[in-house]
Amino acid sequence: MDATQPQYELSVVTQCLKSAIDVIQWLIPTITKFSQSHPLVFQLLFIFFTFYVFYKLLMNFITLVKRFLYLTLVVTCIGIYMRGSQQFLTVDLLNFYNFVMSNRYYAFKIYTLFINALEREINTVYHLAQMKMEQLLK
């Protein structure tokens, strides 16, 4: 057992990130060699890949917005059906708006808790990557 290397119980996220680092360490020199030997093909592939990723992200975002609007429409229809249009539009929407405005920092609190939990994982991966770099430089 190596005394200099601390033993970590690696979670699934840490294992995935470690594997991703290994793949990236192999990919960077390969891509560099390919881009030096075939610059035009590399540029065309990079542009195509960039547009493809942008297109997929845009389509996923549009799908997400459409699903949110459908859900909002369904909830609104159910609310109007159950409470009546006058009650729903004048009282319920106002109460919902006041509730959202009073708890607007709730999502930020959840986000902060998530970031704090993720920071421990990132520190573990950073330490492992730093040790691997030190081993490679020796």
Curated annotation (Swiss-Prot):
Residues 1-39, 85-138 are cytoplasmic. The chain crosses the membrane at residues 40-58, 68-84. One of its GO terms (cellular component) is membrane. InterPro entries: APQ12 (IPR024316). Residues 59-67 are perinuclear space. GO terms for biological process: lipid homeostasis; mRNA transport; nuclear envelope organization. Keywords: Endoplasmic reticulum, Membrane, mRNA transport, Nucleus, Transmembrane, Transmembrane helix, Transport. It holds the Pfam family Apq12. It is a multi-pass membrane protein. It is found in: Nucleus membrane; Endoplasmic reticulum membrane. Its main location: nucleus. Involved in the regulation of lipid homeostasis in the endoplasmic reticulum, thereby impacting nuclear pore complex biogenesis and localization, and nucleocytoplasmic mRNA transport. Belongs to the APQ12 family. This is Nuclear membrane organization protein APQ12. It comes from Saccharomyces cerevisiae (strain ATCC 204508 / S288c).
